[in-house]
Amino acid sequence: MATPLKLYRNIGIAAHVDAGKTTTTERVLYYTGMSHKIGEVHDGAATMDWMVQEQERGITITSAATTCYWSGMDKQFESHRINIIDTPGHVDFMIEVERSLRVLDGAVVVFDSVAGVEPQSETVWRQANKYGVPRIVFVNKMDRMGANFLRVVSQIKQRLGSTPVVLQLPIGAEEEFKGVIDLIKMKAIQWDEENKGMTFKYVDIPADLKATCEEYRAHIIEAAAEYSEELMEKYLEGEEFTEAEIKKALRHLTITNKVVPVFCGSAFKNKGVQAVLDGVIEYLPSPTDIPDIQGVDEHGDEIHRKTSYDEPFSALAFKIATDPFVGTLTYFRAYSGILKSGDTVYNSVKGKKERIGRLLQMHANSREEIKEVRAGDIAAAVGLKTVTTGDTLCDQDKVVILERMDFPDPVIAVAVEPKTKADQEKMGIALGKLAQEDPSFRVHTDEESGQTIIQGMGELHLEIIVDRMKREFNVEANVGKPQVAYRETLKQAIEQEGKFVRQSGGRGQYGHVWLKIEPQEPGKGYEFINAIVGGVIPKEYIPAVDKGIQEQMQNGVIAGYPVVDVKVTLFDGSFHEVDSSEMAFKIAGSQCFKQGALKAKPVLLEPIMSVEVVTPEDYMGDVMGDLNRRRGLVQGMEDSPAGKIVRAEVPLAEMFGYSTDLRSATQGRATYTMEFCKYAEAPTNIAEAIIKKQ
């Protein structure tokens, strides 16, 4: 029996590394009856963490997609189908989070009640804002020392700039944490310890909490009143709102991203997770609540597809995974229409047809074969050849390209070589497969040294790639020292003439161009403008000039690093009836760009990372001194229950081995996170040293 679309919820559970997200997901699977034994992360048995490295490191790397059903704590709803995408919280895997947010309709963000809003949480929050994903918050670990629910609520307001609406208050905290108060029903909920919180009872609110509950309930009513004029009138006249009115208003305000409902509990102690599941159903959108999906047709015109079974089929591939039993799995989100196994689909980004063999629905690590996938659902297809992350699959007669995801360029590179010569080919295959799964990871061969270079988003990212090569493909590799991905750019505008002329018996070569080369704002990238008028250079040679410039940009002008953020205008030149060719113009363009760029004040850019260190106060001086030595610029400091938080921008080149140094300087008590921030000009002495090395 197919579930109607309004009973679907596609959600992600997102959080900072240790906020307890995987445990929360485990409880969800347990209470919805999908798994019979609770898998604890610290036993290395969590159902969602199915790669061996994840179980060893206790962090989630691949987002597995799982389907479960829920009909409410009091069985008050029809059975809803919830598709959960488990997202990693580690910054080196931010790309996975971004990718899963793209295909979700809503998210549950888990915060640790002790640590509060951590740097990663801010990143996840920003990405959810970018994709307009409605969310609810679960403040977890209320049973831990130092748990403070209301502090987390105020951080959501201040650090994340959102409007939290508290729907529950905790009864007690730390080891005194007993249950939660439902502020809409105005009842306390207590879960039974014997059956891991499977059953619960409503009891009266403890007398000492009544006043606080009244105060927070008033905030809910105030927020709900914003929803409609009728409610506003009721509110101003001091009338009571019904439970249904409050929930309808909050649902609308959550889906339009005006408020964020906040729940609390302890997943580990089996308290509060079912109430969050009710929140998913009551406040997060179904596929029909979200705006139509936008895309472009083959002519580049904008088109819309409704979430409906009657529309032509369209879907977005958001993850490729290699499965030891069935080979390549392509996870995709269907936005419109119906796809049956055996159908042929069109990959509109690559312009290729693919036949769909088997379709699978995933439950963390077990799989069920299905006959069809309908709009709004998430499934995996087996054995698609040409599909990569971000591709659109659609009906070949009704072509649509849903938006491409933008993936950041890698900031760190290392050389790898197999430990034995015999593994050379195996290593190539392994790296190719891993690169297909992960668009933020790149592989290439250095033409000069012949070495294989892998690039990624951070040291941990590349460590895990090397580790997976060993486990999944049986290839052991030696890893070189990390190299920084520098860039070059220009600081001055210049006009330059470039001529490539060869006259030797027979046909010669002739290409002649004038280029205006100018810097762009950081991050704008490369732009080529054809300003040729009157056919002084024939149309067919112009793409060759562009190509020549781009090839030269890839090879750099001062130190061999790619040139970024320049605008080049081709405004004049000449050609020869017989001797001109695409090749001649490509070489002319390339030489002209190099000569011009050398006069346009070229500079070296280095990647700058945003670093956030949390340290006990006693080590504050050492941490600050060390960041200064690493050419760091401190951006700000604040107090937190875990100690002082220092935010700084530090060049990536200075951050290698930082975790070891920080550990020894603070006896292992400080922690840090780091993510790419921007490219900035390297100081002259540093730039000179790098140029010399080249």
From Swiss-Prot:
Residue ranges annotated for the tr-type G domain, each copy included: 6-288
Origin superkingdom: Bacteria
Keywords: Cytoplasm, Elongation factor, GTP-binding, Nucleotide-binding, Protein biosynthesis
Residues in coiled coil: none
InterPro entries: EFG_II, EFG_III, EFG_III/V, EFG_IV, EFG_V, EFG_V-like, EFTu-like_2, G_TR_CS
Binding-site residues, GTP: 15-22, 86-90, 140-143
Cellular compartment(s): Cytoplasm
GO cellular component: cytoplasm
Any one GO BP annotation for this protein: ribosome disassembly
Gene Ontology molecular function, alphabetical: GTP binding; GTPase activity; guanosine tetraphosphate binding; translation elongation factor activity
Chief localization: cytoplasm
Protein family: Belongs to the TRAFAC class translation factor GTPase superfamily. Classic translation factor GTPase family. EF-G/EF-2 subfamily.
Known function: Catalyzes the GTP-dependent ribosomal translocation step during translation elongation. During this step, the ribosome changes from the pre-translocational (PRE) to the post-translocational (POST) state as the newly formed A-site-bound peptidyl-tRNA and P-site-bound deacylated tRNA move to the P and E sites, respectively. Catalyzes the coordinated movement of the two tRNA molecules, the mRNA and conformational changes in the ribosome.
UniProt name for this protein: Elongation factor G
Source organism (scientific name): Legionella pneumophila (strain Lens)
